[in-house]
């Protein structure tokens, strides 16, 4: 709450005192609930010093303090208006009584609003001392108020008057807090410190609650809400895990090749199961692993070659599969584009036809007022269909359904009137041939565009089909080449094996011939006695027998060579 003090007259009337101002303020503004609970203006005013009174807790209320209008400076004899003359008797006996005005307050917290005054009032100590207000800035609490209360109001009035007259700039304002106000007015708080945020006591007369207590409650509620939000924040951060959906595999997609060990496992699993039918999968896998480790590199290479060939075939099939997917996607996108273009053309034609229909009907008006005289059952019996327009826009077709129970004398004039309106509209369409030609041109352009789009789509489809055929041909050629290579490799291996077998046979024959020659040489080197005895005949007789196998062996060699030649010839014919 901002309390404003207005300047008094320059002459400082003697009749103005602190009690009069408080009496006027309590009587006029607060009624029964007085601001300072002052007594009435009579001789019992000083009895208030012996009584205790409570200051109400001022909430957000706003009080209007009327300005104190001073008399003009030209008339010094008039110190105060006539309305304040009866109260001058209260200020006269103050010095004669000798009693001190010591208001007492119960030990309670006060929620008094700050009063805004000029800042230079606090800084200029000389002005305050000259006006009679003695301020001790070192002490913030004063026990008793020992001066004349009239001097306080006079000093305050002089301070505001000095601010208005230009001694102090009015723009510099400061705020006096509660402790400074209590120190200046001499409020004896009984040793209780004034707290700005303490709630009002329950004995306070004001019905409104203290704003400080409500602020504290709101702060507590906000703190509790913040704690609750912090507790619920980690719970809300945890989101349930959504199960990942497995993608459905396309049955047309080629399968990935199997490793060499998997091929070996397939080959050996059946044999192991046959030998050990009660063996588990783990035992079988252990046996297969040991067998795989015991295999040589050549046998492993056989399975590795098979896997490499399967990988090559898989890559080729995968390329073909992806090409087919691309072609399908392109075809679907082309179909979607054609559908969209057709829909757009249809929508544009519908819009143009509806616009032309509306313009023709607005130019020639609606059905004349003669059908309005028909009875209420007429709209139910006659239901005109909407006007249908064709593309050339040369004629407008209308159809009217007439109920069986409708009298003929009512239907005839209605049909005749509608016919006249339709004829008028037809003539109007004939009158504007330029519009028809423009529409016809637009339709022709749209048809041409559609035809071009269709042709482009067909060309794209043909190109895609050709690409697909080319890919298939390439795949077939590659497969045929691969098959031929495998066949050639097999034939080469067979030819090599045959050559090796022939070489082995030739080596065996050569060894056999060498042995025979050695034996023959040994027999010739032995000395034979020249005796015509049966022993010599027996000894000499085996020589031709031993030498006789030579022509047989010579005959056997050409037979073997002829056989090898016959085996090589069919192989050459295959190549």
Curated annotation (Swiss-Prot):
Keywords linked to the UniProt accession: Activator, Apoptosis, DNA-binding, Nucleus, Transcription, Transcription regulation
DNA-binding region coordinates: 254-322
Keyword DNA-binding included in the entry's annotation: yes
One GO molecular-function entry: DNA binding
Compositional bias of kind Basic and acidic residues: 222-238
GO biological process: apoptotic process; negative regulation of neuron apoptotic process; positive regulation of transcription by RNA polymerase II; regulation of apoptotic process
UniProt cross-references to InterPro entries, sorted A to Z: HMG_box_dom, HMG_box_dom_sf, TOX_HMG-box_domain
Domain of life of the organism encoding this protein: Eukaryota
Main location: nucleus
Annotated SUPFAM superfamilies: HMG-box (SSF47095)
Compartments, as annotated in UniProt: Nucleus
Composition bias type Polar residues, residue spans: 527-541
Annotated signal peptide: none
GO CC annotation: cytosol; nucleoplasm
Region (Disordered): 189-258, 516-575
Record keyword DNA-binding present: yes
Comp. bias intervals (Basic residues): 239-249
Biased composition annotated in UniProt, kind: Low complexity: 195-214, 516-526, 548-575
Protein task: Transcriptional coactivator of the p300/CBP-mediated transcription complex. Activates transactivation through cAMP response element (CRE) sites. Protects against cell death by inducing antiapoptotic and repressing pro-apoptotic transcripts. Stimulates transcription from the estrogen-responsive or BCL-2 promoters. Required for depolarization-induced transcription activation of the C-FOS promoter in neurons. Associates with chromatin to the estrogen-responsive C3 promoter region.
Domain commentary: The C-terminus is required for calcium responsiveness but not for transactivation activity.
Protein name: TOX high mobility group box family member 3
Organism lineage string: Eukaryota, Metazoa, Chordata, Craniata, Vertebrata
Gene name per UniProt: Tox3
């Amino acid at each position: 709450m901002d309390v404003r003090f207005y300047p008094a007259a320059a002459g400082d009337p003697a009749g103005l005192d602190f009690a009069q101002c408080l009496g006027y303020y309590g009587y006029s503004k607060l009624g029964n609930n007085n601001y300072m609970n002052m007594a009435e203006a009579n001789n019992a005013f000083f009895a208030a010093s012996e009584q205790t009174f409570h200051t109400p807790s001022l909430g957000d209320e706003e009080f209007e303090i009327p300005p104190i209008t001073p008399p003009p400076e030209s008339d010094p004899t008039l110190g105060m208006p006539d309305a304040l003359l009866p109260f001058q008797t209260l200020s006269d006996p103050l010095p004669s009584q000798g009693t001190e005005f010591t208001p007492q307050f119960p030990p309670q917290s006060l929620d008094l609003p700050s009063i805004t005054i000029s800042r230079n009032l606090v800084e200029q100590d000389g002005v305050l001392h000259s006006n009679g207000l003695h301020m001790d800035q070192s002490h913030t609490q004063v026990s008793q108020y020992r001066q004349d209360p009239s001097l306080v109001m006079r000093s305050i009035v002089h301070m505001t008057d000095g601010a208005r007259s230009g001694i102090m700039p009015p723009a510099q304002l400061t705020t006096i807090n509660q402790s400074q106000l209590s120190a200046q007015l001499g409020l004896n708080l009984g040793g209780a410190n004034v707290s700005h945020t303490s709630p009002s006591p329950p004995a306070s007369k004001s019905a409104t609650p203290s704003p400080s207590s409500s602020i504290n409650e709101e702060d507590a509620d906000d703190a509790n809400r913040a704690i609750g939000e912090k507790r619920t924040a980690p719970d809300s951060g945890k989101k349930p895990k959504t199960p990942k959906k497995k993608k459905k595999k396309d049955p047309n997609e080629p399968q990935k090749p199997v490793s060499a060990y998997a091929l070996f496992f397939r080959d050996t699993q059946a044999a192991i199961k046959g030998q050990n039918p009660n063996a588990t999968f783990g035992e079988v896998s252990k046996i297969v692993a040991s067998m795989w480790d015991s295999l040589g590199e050549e046998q492993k290479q056989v399975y590795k070659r098979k896997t490499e060939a399967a990988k090559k075939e898989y890559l080729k099939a995968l390329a073909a599969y992806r090409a087919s997917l691309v072609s399908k996607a392109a075809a679907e996108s082309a179909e979607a584009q054609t559908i969209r273009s057709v829909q757009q053309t249809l929508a544009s034609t519908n819009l143009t036809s509806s616009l032309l229909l509306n313009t023709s009907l607005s130019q020639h008006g609606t059905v004349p007022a003669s059908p309005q005289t028909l009875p209420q059952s007429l709209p139910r019996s006659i239901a005109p269909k909407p006007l249908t327009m064709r593309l050339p826009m040369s004629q407008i077709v209308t159809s009217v359904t007439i109920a069986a129970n409708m009298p003929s004398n009512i239907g005839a004039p209605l049909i005749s009137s509608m016919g006249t309106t339709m004829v008028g509209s037809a003539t109007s369409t004939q009158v504007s041939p330029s519009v028809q030609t423009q529409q016809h041109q637009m339709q022709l352009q749209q048809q041409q565009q559609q035809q071009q789009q269709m042709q482009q789509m067909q060309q794209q489809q043909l190109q895609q089909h050709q690409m697909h055929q080319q890919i298939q041909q390439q795949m077939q050629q590659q497969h045929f080449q691969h098959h031929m290579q495998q066949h050639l490799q097999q034939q080469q291996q067979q030819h090599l094996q045959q050559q090796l077998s022939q070489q082995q046979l030739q080596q065996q024959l050569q060894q056999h011939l060498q042995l025979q020659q050695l034996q023959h040489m040994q027999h010739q080197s032995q000395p034979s006695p020249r005796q015509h005895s049966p022993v010599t005949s027996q000894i000499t007789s085996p020589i031709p027998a031993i030498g006789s196998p030579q022509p047989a062996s010579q005959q056997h060699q050409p037979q073997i060579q002829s056989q090898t030649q016959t085996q090589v010839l069919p192989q050459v014919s295959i190549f």
